[in-house]
Amino acid sequence: MPRSKSYNTYSSLQRPEFRKRVDELLLKFERDFYEKSKGAEGMLDANKFDLDLYKRHNVETMIRIGLKRAVDPLVANYWATRDPQLSKEWGLYGAEEGRHDRMFAGDLHKVGMTDEEIYAIRPTFATELLNGYFYYTLATEGPLASMISGFYLEYIAGKTQPDWLDIMEQHVGANNTKGARAHLALDEDDDHVDMVWNMIMRVIKTEEDEERFVEHLTKINSLFVSYFVEVYAATVLGLGSDPSQLTQVSPGAAVQTNLQARVAAV
């Protein structure tokens, strides 16, 4: 049974052959992240758990949700006169996802952070760049990049977060990750990965559209990888008090990740 008003109502997966290609690309992104991003392998090692990294990761998740909450209504509005059904579906999805930041806030409260402390933290440069990309592409070509980001997050969270939470719970306790677990459970029960995919496939019509999808996906992945590198540098490496160094970390990691993905695709 669906747990929210935003669940997969499509009878079948749209453009399955293209999805197979995208799944393979996302699996490569995940593998490269663990192999090439400094500190990433530690997310799977209980001996390398860092409480500050855990807190900062959850705070950034809340920040991203809050920022996306302002973008999703623009996506729904864009489709209002072009594809009213898609406008309705995306509106419901954005309204549901936009409330999930409080799930993570509950987990942070349990490890000693107050709302005042949470909301005093500014987004990483990588998150600022990501949201700038959403607004830029929305103004110049439409909301596809922002929509693809929704699919990317649903897919990657389903692949990575269960293992990460298993490690985290060894240190903070399962009672203190209930918000993150509830978020995953809702996404799984309402089949958000395939739902968001099917919504996007309503507007993917040609091979050129598919290539643009892959280009957006590659850039979005590079910015999410750079977000992790930036958060790791700020917490585990202790660079959080030096903003000048952190602002160099993000674009450097993004460019490197993007180039690696493009070289591998040739």
Each language-model region and where it sits:
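Non-heme di-metal
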Residues: 2-266
